[in-house]
Curated annotation (Swiss-Prot):
Coiled coil residues, start to end: none
Organism from which the protein derives: Rhodothermus marinus
The family this protein is said to belong to: Belongs to the GroES chaperonin family.
Name of the encoding gene: groES
Protein name (database record): Co-chaperonin GroES
MF annotations from Gene Ontology: ATP binding; metal ion binding; protein folding chaperone; protein-folding chaperone binding; unfolded protein binding
First-listed, main subcellular location of the protein, grouped into a coarse class: cytoplasm
Family annotation (CDD domains): cpn10
PROSITE patterns: CHAPERONINS_CPN10 (PS00681)
Keywords of the record: Chaperone, Cytoplasm
Length: 100
């Protein structure tokens, strides 16, 4: 079977959420019922941007960016057993930049 690829439209992005924390900093395991919904992930695909007042607005994020988003942002989808989120770029709160 062919691998499915998602191509988002307009100002939408596809994000692969980071897995939820399995245990606390002190080493206690967190049960599934108490795990926080992830709010960070990696951008997998980016739409072409949107048109506003006749001007094309380019996207601020790109594939591979690590981003923060709201707890209830986006639409959850499952493809080939993998969980993804599709959301508008405006639902992304920020890009995580690692210091070197």
């Amino acid at each position: 079977m062919a691998k499915v690829k998602i191509k988002p439209l307009s100002d939408r992005v596809v994000i692969k959420p980071e897995p939820p924390e399995e245990k606390t900093e002190s080493g206690l395991y967190i049960p599934d019922t108490a795990k926080e919904k992830p709010q960070r992930g990696t951008v997998i695909a980016v739409g072409p941007g949107r048109v506003e007042n006749g001007t094309k607005i380019e996207m601020s994020v790109k594939e591979g960016d690590k981003v923060l988003y709201g707890k209830y942002a986006g639409t959850e989808i499952t493809i080939d057993g993998e969980e993804y989120l599709i959301m508008r770029e405006t639902d992304i709160l920020g890009i995580i930049e690692e210091e070197k």
